[in-house]
Amino acid sequence: MKNIFQIFLFLLISYSLNSQKIDSFFSKDGTEIFYEEFGSKGKTIVLLSGGPGLNPHYLETLYNQLKQNYRCILLHQRGTGKSLLKTINQESLLVEKYIDDLNGLYKKLGGEKLILVGHSWGGMLSFSYAANEPEKIKKIILLNSGGVTDKFYSWFGSNINMRLLPEDNKLYQEQIDNKQDVLVAIWPGYFFDRKIALKTRPPLDFKFRNQDGVNPLASGDWRKKSDERVSKLKNYNGPIDLI
């Protein structure tokens, strides 16, 4: 009986160490920002998802691997996941609001310098945070990130188009004709492996790219601040890893 109890206690402790935790804080403008925590050992890393506007759970494969050796914080950026906005407009999606959110997370985690792991837009947001709050970052890790300025958009589209097949282009035109978002059509162009692209496409919600969605509003403001960001980034002296 004692052995059974010990086994049960061990399993219970193991589950609690590896289970998901959900918490939140209120940002400067009163928006409640949620985050999830996976794993409990090792260094703390903050995962910043792409979009802007994608539900962060598409990074599940990544944090399920990392949680074995790290404490992973999955931030639900404003307007995504559980971090709902009362109003989605240009004011609520300014880059400075995202920076306020990361400052709130920084305080919530005890004021320890952050290790930011940014995918796509998440990397672009990491640049913005480093430009404005360089002393609060320990390290930046970029996963298929966009650039520091909006100049990368000029070749970004070409890289996507060269991977598209006739069937993708047909769907692209159909989406335009039906006034639907085109990302569902060009999604395979973001991947080296088409099979993986097609496998990940169905669960995604592409409404975030609609005219009044998170994507055009947040990325639009980010593009406006390119010169300012480049100038301020000179103050960040920490390491940046590119993957």
Task: Give the residues covered by each predicted segment.
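Bacterial Sec-dependent N-terminal signal peptides
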Residues: 1-22, 241
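Conserved HGGG/HGGXW glycine-rich cap/lid loop of the alpha/beta-hydrolase fold
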Residues: 27-85
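Conserved hydrolase catalytic core segment
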Residues: 112-154
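Alpha/beta-hydrolase
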Residues: 173-231, 238
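Short beta-strand/loop motif that positions the catalytic acidic residue
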Residues: 236, 242-243
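Active-site loop/oxyanion-hole signature of alpha/beta-hydrolase fold enzymes
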Residues: 77-121
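Active-site acidic short loop of glycosyltransferases
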Residues: 40-42, 68, 107-112, 135, ...
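Flexible "cap/lid" loop of the alpha/beta hydrolase fold
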Residues: 140-174
